[in-house]
Amino acid sequence: MRNFVITTDNTADLPYDYYKKNQIEYLFLSYTMDGKNYQKNAEMDPGEFYRKMRQGSMPTTSQANVEETMETWRPLLDEGNDILHLAFSSGLSGSCNSARIAANELKESYPDRKITVVDSLCASLGEGLFVDYAVEMKKAGKDMEEIAGWLEEHKLNFCHVFTVDDLNHLYRGGRVSKAAAVLGTMINIKPVLHVDNEGHLIPLGKVRGRKKSLIKL
């Protein structure tokens, strides 16, 4: 069986120890908060990150671009590995498209290696679960083609349904209008959302109050 490495995006929200333990390389979608840009080797502690958000800090994110993707993959290819990349939903980010472009660019330099990009249509821990299935299948001795095929066949079975406590971040991401965010905040509206079969973030409904939103889930 050909050697291969699983790669993904850090949007899978898995612990960094998990990546290290399972020898997974991840593409870092950098973010800027309070004027400081955070890169792969300068992660902020998650507790500190969310504390700053609650205090009003507004992070902005950047997708992994083609060159950054190729820089992550080249050492793996140089070591004789194929690559199975499990990408953040193409309905939420351009990172999957960047990965596909990078894979095509690298074909010329590494004609004997194979790079397979799977659009997970997932986000956050849904993507993390997607990755974990791939990891367990690899441990069970499945080859890259078997794993990629299974993931493509079953990816619509990974369901995301969730609620958020703050409408302002949905407004900043273009998910709701400013008027809806302001009014919803005033009357304590909590949306219930899901990720559809094309990987887009779609509202399922809305209720008043955090407790009711959790019951709705």
Locate each region found by the language model.
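Mixed-charge interfacial surface used for oligomerization/domain docking
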Residues: 2-3, 12-19, 24-25, 30, ...
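Glycine/charged-rich beta-loop-alpha catalytic/anionic-binding loops adjacent to active sites
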Residues: 52, 80-85, 108-118
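Active-site cofactor/cluster-binding pocket
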Residues: 67-83, 87-103, 107
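Short beta-strand segments
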Residues: 8, 87-89, 118-119
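N-terminal glycine-rich anion-binding loop in soluble enzyme alpha/beta folds
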Residues: 5-64, 68
